[in-house]
Amino acid sequence: MVDLEATSTGSKAKIIQVGIVVIEDGKIVDHYTTDVNPHEPLDAHIKELTGLTDQRLAQAPDFSQVARKIFDLVEDGIFVAHNVQFDANLLAENLFFEGYELRNPRVDTVELAQVFFPELEKYSLPILCRELGIPLKHAHTALSDAQATAELLLFLREKMAQLPKGLLERLLEMADALLYESYLVIEEIYRNQSILNSSDLVQVQGLYFKKTGATLEPRKLSQDFSKNISLLNLEVRERQESFAKEVGLLLKDEPVSLIQAPTGIGKTYGYLLPALSQMKERQIVLSVPTKILQNQIMEEEGKRLEEVFHIDIHSLKGPQNYLKLDAFYRSLQENDENRLFRRFKMQLLVWLTETETGDLDEIGQLYRYQHFLADLRHDGNLSSQSLFMTEDFWKRSQERAQTCKLLVTNHAYLVTRLEDNPEFVSDRLLIIDEVQKILLALENLLQETHDIQSIIDLLDKALLEEQNKVQQRILESIRFECLYLIEQFQSGKSKKNILDSLANLHQYFSELKVEGFEELVRYFTAEGDYWLETTETSQKKIQISSTKSGRILLSSLVPESCQVLGVSATLEISQRVSLADLLGYPEAKFVKIEAGKKQDQEVVLVKDFPLVTETSLEVYAKEVADLLMDVQAFQQPILVLFTSKDMLLAVSDLLPVSHLAQYKNGDVHQLKKRFEKGEQQILLGAASFWEGVDFSSHPFVIQVVPRLPFQNPQEPLTKKINQELNQEGKNAFYDYQLPMAIIRLKQALGRSMRREHQRSLTLILDRRIVGKRYGKQIVASLAKEASVTTIAQSEVNEAIDRFLNEL
């Protein structure tokens, strides 16, 4: 095992420290370390990273003085390193200049870890050590890193030894996807492996699956909420208990009810425990706004309920979230030339021995493989000729959904399923958490989206087959307009050009008579609004979307036999606009648990920050970035909540320090985990970060809101509701848009108030909150829940310092 510390990671790097650990027969038998004099001063960040100093290295030997010793240690072995390319190449180069040729086989523990621990999101040595419980006392010290790499290799060997010999054989067949000679480790374990299969696995068509465990007999919950909480080893909280009591009363008496309660009181247990204790015969369906929260509930509250009360809990998502085994099996028969895809298939083979659900979200770096996943995702169809009829994950999930006691899903899947089959929730209790968010999910049912590049691909195919010259010209014209749309959208040029192009598409499609284009003809010739957007995946596809007129009410999808409980921290919109009305339940019972002012939360309004509506994006982003640099000096977690992707990316580009940014560093779930683990101090987020992600691990969080979260009046749902309210003689801004902005701000405050004694300070930089008439309404509402102060920008550091000293 070799680890080098160097002056840089570039081609001119010089070795400053060497660490070597020797393994024989699965045991560490020797180790060696030495500093090396690079004869040049170290950069400040290298000193900070390694703890080495120029003075110390000045006393160290030259590499020529230790080269023989190093070569003797590594000459006859396999060269193993974490990111072997850097260490092996640098050492080989330095040894070559001293007359020694390093030609050892090379093994990279990074790639092996990626294959055999597919659920991890990061594979740096410190993170792997933390996740696997490997000691790493002094990261970026050569010997310490080499020892940790040795322990990691032993851990990997142990993991491989637990796998069936047949699986190792298949992995070896694909091991040319690994760099260098990393396959040697798998080969050694394979040679020594017995043919006996694990009793925990079942083999089907050469694939190995984890056997499903038997469902435990559920334990009876008490009617006393405090007893159930105590059994979960949690403290009883007064407001949580009050909330649970109200939920219990609503479940006894009300067919449809809405309950509002403040963040941070433990609402999830507050509604689940009363529901589970009362609904002895009926299934409970819980819907949450996002898949992230769905996963979070399964990993946290759901896991505890299973452990303590043996509740049969299942998470149900759309079919595309699951691996389609028939498609994966076919891909294994193909000799794919893409090395990354072959390695991904190796990961999937290992993952199949561990997963019980087949939910692709379990794979840590899934975003890296989006290009390969289109053909592997489940489409919801299962052929009667399937080789995996029993093991099919989507089929299993559907069956579990019918029999489990508590079914957890998300708003998007819920409304889609209800549209197809309202009986999905018949005679069940439906709990909708963050119920106001289901309005957007309902609106999305009316939207239709097409990928422009996919349309172009379809046109190219049709042009090769179409014989009619007139129709050929129409196809060519449509293709030109599609390419023009992409060009105009990417360049950010005149909106008029895009509108003209859409009008041309409307005309061309109305004249198109080619078979296979009927759906697109209907789509482009229908009356309605269209808009272009970029997908938030690694492929950045440009899509065109449209929406139908009118709104779908939740009440129109849910059968009367279903009892409905809507929950949120923010249900009240305004005196003249009711969420119950917007959902189609004007008679719903409404209960409110008063929030009360939180002593651990402060909102700070910056009265002299540049006015966002009169400042260019570039200038405003620079001001925000400069402020963040001042705030980061306090060494506290900073969550920045943006209303615009463009602003977020502009600030990210200007920040000179390492940070996490949505749209750049993985999906929301991964960013949340990395931020909670303290990988980076600053997280820039938008969209789901306002209301769909909770942060509970940090005792103190600084939140920054660069712009008030008003909804875009051109968004389809907002536009429709505004039109409805105007027709009813109401003021769309004061009765809906302003209250919704206040709701979103309150939800933002709740992101970092998830448990008792957690503290947060929120900086609102948009000075409209102190300069506009409506700002008083926002401040008055926030002041009911947190301390609100107004300061100058020059006083920000002082305000943070004061708040920190109160900890």
Language-model segments: which ranges?
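Signature of the SF2 helicase/ATPase Hel1-core->accessory helical subdomain module
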Residues: G380-L406, H411-F509, L571-L583, Q714
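Conserved motor-coupling elements within RecA-like helicase/translocase cores
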Residues: Q398-C404, H659-L683
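Conserved RecA-like P-loop NTPase helicase motor core
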Residues: D608-S616, L671-D766
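Walker A/P-loop
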Residues: K252-L273
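Acidic, Mg2+-coordinating catalytic module of metal-dependent nucleases/exonucleases
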Residues: E75-Q85, N89-N94, S124-I186, T762-I764
